[in-house]
Amino acid sequence: DYKNITIIKDFDPSIPDLFIDSYLIENGILNLTKNAKDALLDSKTSNPIIRIVTRISHGEIIDGERNSTVCKISVIDNGPGIQEEIKDSIFFPMITGKDKGTGLGLSITQGIISQHKGNIHFSSEPNRTEFFINIPITNNKELDLKTANG
């Protein structure tokens, strides 16, 4: 339930159509926003905010390969931050900082982003956690859809 959380959508209108599996990418972003929501509600953060930001970037390096154009997606919250003891393993299956979590959401999200030849990383400190997703933009529809669908 997001009713007490301010959601700010800051979308770049210049992003071209992406040849991705939008259902999978949407699920990955939903995993990140759900984690942000849970952290905000569990910590009883006053004035809880989740920001979803999209931007275009040029010349990004993903897995050692320079990409001419990349879609950058960020999910940012003002919650308590990720516990120090799980930061190094947060993308591993069964790792969670929540009492009721399964520890699968971030692992699944990382797999989805990898299928799209992208990457995901984060920075976290008290009052700010940001997950960064980078997905290369390509004009090769057939290759991208084949990769995205396995």
What does each model-found stretch correspond to?
Residues T6-P16, R55-S57:
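Conserved catalytic submotifs in the C-terminal HATPase_c
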Residues G105, T109:
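Short alpha-helical Gxxx[C/S/T] motif in the catalytic ATP-binding
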Residues I113-S114:
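Detector for a conserved hydrophobic position within an alpha-helical segment of the HATPase_c
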Residues N47-E60:
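Short beta-strand/loop element within the Bergerat-fold HATPase_c
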